[in-house]
Amino acid sequence: MQTPRASPPRPALLLLLLLLGGAHGLFPEEPPPLSVAPRDYLNHYPVFVGSGPGRLTPAEGADDLNIQRVLRVNRTLFIGDRDNLYRVELEPPTSTELRYQRKLTWRSNPSDINVCRMKGKQEGECRNFVKVLLLRDESTLFVCGSNAFNPVCANYSIDTLQPVGDNISGMARCPYDPKHANVALFSDGMLFTATVTDFLAIDAVIYRSLGDRPTLRTVKHDSKWFKEPYFVHAVEWGSHVYFFFREIAMEFNYLEKVVVSRVARVCKNDVGGSPRVLEKQWTSFLKARLNCSVPGDSHFYFNVLQAVTGVVSLGGRPVVLAVFSTPSNSIPGSAVCAFDLTQVAAVFEGRFREQKSPESIWTPVPEDQVPRPRPGCCAAPGMQYNASSALPDDILNFVKTHPLMDEAVPSLGHAPWILRTLMRHQLTRVAVDVGAGPWGNQTVVFLGSEAGTVLKFLVRPNASTSGTSGLSVFLEEFETYRPDRCGRPGGGETGQRLLSLELDAASGGLLAAFPRCVVRVPVARCQQYSGCMKNCIGSQDPYCGWAPDGSCIFLSPGTRAAFEQDVSGASTSGLGDCTGLLRASLSEDRAGLVSVNLLVTSSVAAFVVGAVVSGFSVGWFVGLRERRELARRKDKEAILAHGAGEAVLSVSRLGERRAQGPGGRGGGGGGGAGVPPEALLAPLMQNGWAKATLLQGGPHDLDSGLLPTPEQTPLPQKRLPTPHPHPHALGPRAWDHGHPLLPASASSSLLLLAPARAPEQPPAPGEPTPDGRLYAARPGRASHGDFPLTPHASPDRRRVVSAPTGPLDPASAADGLPRPWSPPPTGSLRRPLGPHAPPAATLRRTHTFNSGEARPGDRHRGCHARPGTDLAHLLPYGGADRTAPPVP
């Protein structure tokens, strides 16, 4: 027996295998954390929920906290709440409760609240939310509140929270709506803010006020400067202030809405332009795009900026770390990229980008078209122009129309330092400790998610930057949100949203702020490794070390105690065996997340399998329809084809076969001549004739006149305008005028019973036949009373109207009354039978021909009407195939 050969693999299967094989390379698995802190540790973390001295909980009936801003000044924490400002001491550390020592109540006055309500705002929105909380000098706090959509600012003593001086307007310094983002900082005694300046939040602005320099702002309502920005952070470095934000990119307007991350800078000493151009506006404002992407043939970008750290020194370079995420309607993912401010400054010295017309794309500006001195530089004494107001108009006009740089700011290593795509909640907050460990030489990054989960990473900036796997180590994952103290029934995820993550390096803790509480969490939980040297050293945590007494201790900077530690990740196989490290990630087990590899593999497999199944299904259905059509054509050909020569017999010539014997004309033997016509007609009838019914009147009584031909088309129906003039016309009991009357020629389309043997020669008209019947010559067939055989639509077809149905009782014809199917006397529809003929069969007619008045010249078919059997019900007029479509 021959062994069957294996069928070659299908192309779809090969494509599926290739895609599945490449998915692992494109989406590498991210390592889980080396350890996960038990959730019961949360019960030991100190929390602030508004408690004051002498009370463990807030007063009964007091409003819940609605924290907006948190500021740490040395060992004091200032918390900006709704209508309140708290001063909390972080020393001495407590393990149960954080309480305020001072409280400032700052409510909106009733008039501001009434105006706010009149503008359509809710009562809960017409409050004073603290949105700006800054240290102005060593003894003064600068605080701004929304004040019921009428922002106001004030100075307060840092020790007593007593007001210092008068209140000032908060316009362009504080947002109207507490939900709007804003940033602010003091530099050289001047306040730099980024917010919106109007009630509708349309006019976004970077604003400088206070100090000894004039007030400046960005150009108003210019999409080249700002397009729906969301301000994230601001830092001071050198002679500039840098603002980090995200906005809709105008240079990608051909791609609909594209959100990109930006960094903009202004000169501290900018005094504005001339009275002709950019008066009281920035002359040094420039912006560039931040590039945080995964390299490859096609870069995968993280465009949504979430958080930025202050300027830190890594390897002697000024660096900021920024958290980026994907858009909310994209694959969830977050990345941490580092940016060197020297590279940022170099980009601002590069090429500009412009759009020559509203319909054109953005292109680089040739260097020969850039005026000198270079636009965007800081004019200062000793330079060609000692002030920005002295700059020529061409330079000022160029700055006004060309604020965007052509190149993007690259991230350090041209790749993210940390990449997480397995998190259900995106990373939105970041804190960095560049002096971690007993020697202060390690860098630890804390990343906070929307739900309060914190991820701790050990970053090695000097390591190879070829990939993210060797650059960072996922040390630990722990929770910071205490639902028993920070939550309330019906609070949902809004109350769990992480507002800020502040590092308190002096006490070795993190300050996690939520809308209703502030939790202080230790940066490490070394005690969970006590009793197991392998776990303590294998954790690679720079905050933990193995002590000689057999415990895992916390190592603060400058620790002099003896300990063992290994942050390089060396093998711990020689350190004994004990309970393994906790590796069950909270983000995987508790949140029930799915691996990106599994997600991509499942999506690709579902697409390929669905495409293959759909293709086979469509092909099968199309083939089935073709096979049915082919079988139908073959059946019709087999019915109409007969004889040796496969000659086609026209149904309109079946009447000629009556005159032929079994052998054809003259008794000749023609192929198929002996086939009775009813046998050929039966398959064509759509209503399923019974053979016995066909043959009950004789096998050769089918008349060619009773089969309509395709050339014939019925005429439209006609109503009877007046009673029929014939004395035997239909009386009052006849059909109404909406039903057609039978024409005289309709008798040629009715099947009548006859004896088994037809006469060889028809008798003369009016003479009796051998069986006692009178023979009447048929008139020529008229097209207005016949139907075509096929139901195909044509412009000349007429609608077929159903006539009233009912049994035809021939016995009642003698009373002279019209019947539901009584023919007009001018054109008898039946052949009169002999006196001894059998009674006619009961007929129920469901369709009729279009009717008209009796035509002149119609002759009676017999001397008098006699009952006969009507076989009209054998024709498929009642079937669906015989119903003509409406005339369009």
UniProtKB/Swiss-Prot annotation:
Family matches, as PROSITE patterns: SEMA (PS51004)
InterPro entries assigned to the protein according to its UniProt record, in alphabetical order: Plexin_repeat, Semap_dom, Semap_dom_sf, Semaphorin, WD40/YVTN_repeat-like_dom_sf
One Gene Ontology CC term in the entry: plasma membrane
Bilayer topology annotation: Single-pass type I membrane protein
Residue ranges that the UniProt entry lists as topological domain Cytoplasmic: 625-888
Record family assignment: Belongs to the semaphorin family.
Name of the protein in its database record: Semaphorin-6B
Organism: Homo sapiens
Lineage of the organism: Eukaryota, Metazoa, Chordata, Craniata, Vertebrata
Gene: SEMA6B
